[in-house]
Each structure stands twice: as C-alpha cells, then as structure tokens.
Amino acid sequence: MVSVKAYYNETVETVRRDLNGEQYKDFLVLILIVSAVVSLFLGETESAAVILVVITMNAILGTVQTIKAENSLESLKQLAAPEAKVVRNGAVVRIPGREITVGDVVHLEAGDYIPANGRVLESASLKVDESALTGESIGVDKISAPLTGELPLGDRRNMVFSGSYVTYGRGVFLVTGIGMNTEVGKIAGLLKNTSEKKTPLQINLDRFGKKLSMIILLLCAVLFALQVLKGGAVADAFLFAVALAVAAIPEALSSIVTIVLAFGTRKMAKEGAIIRKLQSVEGLGSVSVICSDKTGTLTQNRMTIEHYYVDGRDIPADQIDPANPLQEQMLKFSILCNDSTNVEGQEIGDPTETAMVNLGDKKGISAQEVRDACPRSSEIPFDSDRKLMSTFHKMKDGYTMITKGAVDVMLKRVDYIQKGGKIFPVTEVDVENICRVNEQYSESGLRVLGIGYRHFPVEKNISTEDEQGLVFLGLLAMMDPPRTESAAAVSDCKRAGICPVMITGDHKVTAAAIAKRIGILDDISQACEGVQIDGMSDEELNEFVENIRVYARVTPEHKIRIVRAWQERGNIVAMTGDGVNDAPALKQADVGVAMGITGTEVAKDAASMILTDDNFATIIKAVESGRNIYENIKKAIQFLLSGNFAAILVVIAASLMNLPVPFAPVHLLFINLLTDSLPAIALGLEPYHHDVMGKKPRPVKESILTKEFLIRVGVEGGVIGAVVLTAFLIGYRDGNEVLAGTMAFAVLCLSRLLHGYNCKAGKPVIFTGGFFDNRFMQGAFLSGFVLLTAVLAVPVLHGFFAVQTLKIGELLAVYGLSGVSMLVIQGLKRMVKF
C-alpha cells in the first residue's frame, strides 16, 4: 500500500500486510471451519476441537513463515535518510530531505542523494547514478543547456531525479517536483493500480476445495436419504452422513501444503532465494516466461576491458602483454588519466575508469606505483560537451599530457600515430582503420574510448587549447560482461520450455550484444526499443511480444504492458528487477523477483522473491525447486485423497449392507490428522529430481484432478477400501460393533501408513528400489505405527478412541490385510504403470 504525506517531500510508506488474516482465506480452510461448526452442533466436541486446532496450526505456520521472510527482507534494507543543502535566506544550509519544496535551489556534490526532481542550473562535471530509475549503473553526465523534444528519462541530461545520487563533480538544481510528483512518485502511483496474482496452485486448490465440498454435500445427502428410506432412524442417518463428511474432508491438507512450501523456502534460501510470499514457491514451478533485467542479473554489473586496439592490431584482454612496450604504455596511460582507485578490493570511482585500473592490477601493474612514479600536476576534467579528459604528468624524460575520450572527437585532434616504437604522421588510411575498428566494437555492444598523448618540454597548467596535435596510442573497448553462469542458465531455461526475455533501460545495440552472447537473442530483428511499443494497442502488443526477446530503453509503463501481454497469452510470468522503476512490473508479474544486493527498498517490497546473489542462475534453481515442490504436493494430495476415498467406500458399503457405521469420527480424525499427515508431509519432502527441467511448464489451467490422477486415486482407494471392509466384516462376525470398528480403524490406519510408499513415485518401490531414499518417510511410518500401537495397547485410551484390545489372531489379520493392500497396489503399478 502507498500513502502520501501532504506538504512533505515523501513518496511511499510500506505498510505490513495482515499476515494472520491472510491464512484464513483459503477455501479448504473455510470448509474445515464449517465442518467444525457442524461437529459442534451434533455434540461431537472432540472432533470440533481437533479441527479447530488444525486450522490454528495452519494459520500459525503460514504466519511464522511469512514473518521470517519479512524479517529477512528487513535485514537487506539499508535505508538512507538524506539531508540536502539548499539556499535559504541567501545562505546554503542543511535541512532534512523531507522539508524540501518546489522552488528550492539545491547544491550537490559527489556522494549526495538527490532528494527531488529538478532542472540543472550549474554543472561542474556533474555525473549522476540513475540506476534505481533506469536500471543502468553507468553514470549520466548532467548539463545545464536546454534540450528539445520528448526524451526518455535516461536522456534527460539537464534534469536530476529523486532516487538517484551524485557519483562525481558538483552541481546546482532548481526543485521542480517533490513527493508523488517525482519519477518515484509516478511509479508509486502505478503500484496502486497493480494487483497481485494468485499462483496456479492457489487457483487449483480453490477449485479443488469447491468441487470437493459439492461432492461431499451430494454424497452426504444421498446417504442420509438412503438411510431414511430404508426405515432407519433420522439420528442414525445423520451419524452416517457426518461420518462420511469427516471421512471425505482432508483436514490436514492446508497444513501439509503450508509445511511443504515452508520447507521449500528453507532450501531455496540456502541457494540464494528468499521467499516473501509462501505460495510463490510453487508459482515458480509454473513459470513459462522470465523477463529479466540485464545489468547485474545477466551481467556482472562491473565494467571490464574486453579489447585493446594498439599498433594496428586487435588484442583481446586476456592476451594483453605488459612486456610489450606499446601495450604496457596503454595500461599505464589509462591508469594515469584516471580518477578511480581500488582500496583493499573496494572500487571507488566511475565504472569505466575502475575497469582500467582493474585490468592493470590483473596484469601486475599497480595503480599507486604508476601514479607515484608519474605524478599529476594539472588536469582538465571530463566534460560531457567536450567528451574528453586530460591529465598532465611529470615523466622520466619530460612532461606528458594524456588524453582519453570519445573516438570521433579525439581523431579530430590527432596529428600523429604511434606504431611500434616510432611516431608517424597520421594518414587517412590510419583514420579509416581506427574508425572501422571503432564501429566493429560499437556494433558488438562495447563502449570504446581512445587514448592519446602529447609531450611538453616544460611543466604547465594545461587548458583545452592544449588538446591538439595529439599522438594516437590506441583504443580500449569495454562492457559489463555476462556472468559466467548466465549462458548455461539461459540454456537450462530453454530446455525447461521457459522463454527468457531481456528488458533493460540500456541501448539496443548493447543489450542485443549481451543477449546474443548468452543465447537469449538469435537475430537483431528480435530486439526493439520502448518507443516502438508506444504506438501499439494492447492487442497489437499481445501479438508482438511472441517474436521479441530484447526490449531496450523501456519505461516502467512499458514493462507493465510487456508483462501483461505475456499473461494475456496464457503465460505465467516471472519478472526481475532492482530499481524503483521495476516495482510496478514486479507486482504485476505472477512471480516478482527483486535483487537483494543492488535492489531498492521499493523493488523488494513489490517482489515475492528476493535473490541474495542477484544472479539469473538462481532463478532457474528456484524454478526447479518450484516444479519439484508441486510434484511432491501432488503426491501428498494423491495419498490423502486415495485414503479418504477408501474410508468413503467403506462407509457407503456399510450403509448399503445395513451394517453399523464402521468408524467413529474420532477414528477418522486420528487418521487424517496424525497417521495421514506424517506420510503426506514426508511425500512433500521427497528428494528433488533434476528431470523436471526437461519438461515444458504445465498448462496454467491444468487441474490437479486430471483423469489419470483420479484413476490412480480411485484404484488405490478401492484396494484399501476392500481390505478395510474385509477387516470390518471379520470383526463383526459375532455382532461386536466395537471389535469391528477397531479392526477397520487399525487396517485403515496401517494401510494408509504403508500407502505412503505407494505414492512415492511412478515406479513400484518394492520392485525397483527407492524404498529407503527418504528418511522423512521412515520417520513418518515409525511414528504413525507407534501412535497406532499406543491407541490399541493402552487401555486408558480405549474409551476416548472407541476401540478395544485385539487378540493375536486379530492383530495378525490387521497386519496381513494391510500388507496385502500394499502388495496389490505395488503389483498394479508394476504391471499397469498407472
């Protein structure tokens, strides 16, 4: 939620959700509440109490997990409370950023956070990091000159924006917008109008709960009517109907799903993914499109030198040799004409300049030693209009001015070129070769700078007039390279039937180059810019997105439209982002993924998952976990429904055969809540299988209750129901209802404990192995068996559970019939492979 504070320069205020209330919105939980009320009305206080305990446990589990995730989020937040330097009464004073108002004149220097939107009045090499708004970490050079036309935010160089900060230089700006009237405020407005989506599992469980409730009501009504028509007492008919309802409702399902998802979040947290919204764990398994930011997610978020062009040769960075005089000169000159430093591994300065220092460090050239040997005495700072930077140094053999900057600008000031160890007048052929290489580098998405120099006989304070008659030394080409694991992650993505899409604020050429290198893009025709989207209707965009893999120079509005277009085509969409500009799309996506390291507070609050390593590959691991969790939840549901179906069949059969009600409600609740829950949880924690990533995402509308699934439930429930009815008939041969109920209860309980092994996988574990690969299942079986034994063997419990002591022969019958049910189902799985 977003609130606006009047009169103050404040944008968004995060409000915690009603975490406990959210746990009671699930449809199955509502069914349990109704069943508890009915049980209480019929005098079954024990049943009602147990059901209410289950509901409360489920709410506590969900709330605790969500709070833990929220606390993990809090540990990632590093909130800034900036002050601002403004002109008040003719003097520059510091005031809290929230007190700034339109019309204030604000002074900026390196390290300052920009507290409001404004028009630049003065710029002394002012450079601003706008990555929170544009997603691009390279600083933007600010100017005071007017600009014309409608420009994207990243190109409005005479404006500064709230949410960004100064990385270099100084400046002054006039405040033109505060609070909700800033770019951040506009994004906050978009967040208001973006609703969160339910995951496929939530939708499936809602549908399942509604269908199940209708089936239960219908069966109860039919059974009640049959009993009354047969002349039975209304009270007895009601008892049959209640027994059927209790047998049919999987009371523990909601708790089991919550526990399985919670365990999944723990595993994913160890792999670098913090889950803020529990249901998102499974939602990841349904993802069919991943819209990823480029900078820092697919790339290293660290500018790196890729190539040198020296002495007429292209030299890849890994082949640069400091033993070569010209290459050594390039390394040293790029360090000298440079303001960045590397202090104990911490890079300080402009990313393009730190790339030069880092390369020198890799090649064994210390920046500090080079600078100490060739001290700087004067400089001409970089200017965005001039596009050059020059520094003046005392060398062993005299004085040298080193100049670096845009290639086209530098070539106009070059008169000479260094080849080998000699200097020659530059020729048209030399210029053509340099321009050709520069164009090749640029088309590959590389940022290119030229390095030149000029010797002076004496020391002087250089000026722009001295930036003439330069000797061209070479080109250096750099980029923010892909993460080493990005290409493999994209390949895994495609193998899993997931479409990877890059959405970035960077330029199209750069984005396309990175996308090609990691396998997202096959052809440049699959890349477009945000301005192309502006002229499209929603219907046109829905068709357009299918063929586009890279979107460049996009706005927050573009991102939302792209996500919605994919969703309109029936896809489950994951969206990554780290900036304030990403927040609306993160919320719109089915699964919003924020960056934990570089992400802003607003982005993290809008997301359902946070990556602690900002790595695209971690998303793929999370998708794999989500798919495995869904498969395991299906196994748990299959286990619960087949066991409940067995109990339903026995109750209906007893009614049709004019036999007493086979189970007391407490029998079924004991089974459903204890001996059933443990194996179901164990199934939810089955070992993960990597083969899930070799399949396409399941269809969005695919129900859990598929034809094949229902057949398995029906067959397995029928087998278990048959042996339970047999046990009931054996116990009832002398008309002893308590003995019959005890044997039916014991066989149903033990058969369902063994049935956990039947549901482990598609293969029969007895014949093919895998019986002992899940320690949770061993613990579940032993725990359930001990609980059943205690109920049957401890006399003080007999009254509460409506059972009696079994003789040796009766116990053997219980064990034998339970074992038969498992062997029959395992045999059917081996023969029919259902």
Q: What is each stretch, according to the model?
A:
Residues P699-G718, V738-T742:
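Membrane-water interface at loop-to-transmembrane-helix junctions
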